[in-house]
Amino acid sequence: MQLRRASKNCAFSVGAIPHFFRLAPSPPPPLPPPRSIRRGHQVYTEVCASCHGLARIAYRNLVGVCFNEDEAKAMAEDKDVMDGPNDEGEMFERPGKLSDYFPSPYPNEEAARFANNGAYPPDLSLIMKARVGGPDYVFALLTGYKDPPAGIEPRDTQYYNPYFPGSWIGMPAPIQDGGVDYEDGTPATATQMAKDVCVFLAWAAEPEADERKLMGFKVMTALTVLSGFMWWYKRKVWSTVKHRRLELY
């Protein structure tokens, strides 16, 4: 990431350089998803979902990744979904289904801004692709809250974070040590929580990534075998033609 200049004794105007957090790519054929996806889902549900939506992910996407079908179905049924109209032309609420998408915490953008002092919490479905640096940026943002430097006055409804463009953000520090109680007993440090939710959001941005890698591996394998066969067939067919003498009488 390109180094950016900051004026003396001032915060970065476009955001500081994030410390690096790398997601290990899955080699083809892909390995089973790590348990951190499930832990990241827990962090999202208990910490992030009250303000941020995940509108492009359905409950069925979780099946076989970090939950089994019964667990995902139970999570969906725990939510009430507005549906309709019914035979009488009225909307109604029903328990969620696997085909339903994660619900938004707010009915519209105006309600979201009103509840957050004018700031609009972005949907997190594609946040890893929508921000330069992806996991690096999100991890640095989540763990980078600190007191403003000397000479900079604090603000009432904003918080200092050098990794956010402009250095002031309307979201308070969302994760703290012990913020969740992990199901698998992993110590819930702020760094661990940030890492897990980054892994989950990276998966959410491309839930079909492993399938695409596997398909690419199969296609490349098939093309390699086909290329070898065509090379052998060409040698076999043209071997007699290349060595044949044409005599004119």
Which residues are covered by each model-predicted region?
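Gly/Gly-Pro-rich "capping" loops immediately C-terminal to redox-active cysteine motifs
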Residues: 53-134, 156-184
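The canonical Cys-X-X-Cys-His
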Residues: 44-55, 197, 201
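Juxtamembrane interface at the cytosolic side of transmembrane helices
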Residues: 212-215, 227-249
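Electrostatic cytochrome c docking/interface patches
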Residues: 20-42, 53-64, 72, 209
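Juxtamembrane/start-of-transmembrane alpha-helix segments at the extracytoplasmic/lumenal side
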Residues: 205-222
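Extended, hydrophilic extramembrane loops/domains of integral membrane proteins
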Residues: 171, 175-206, 210
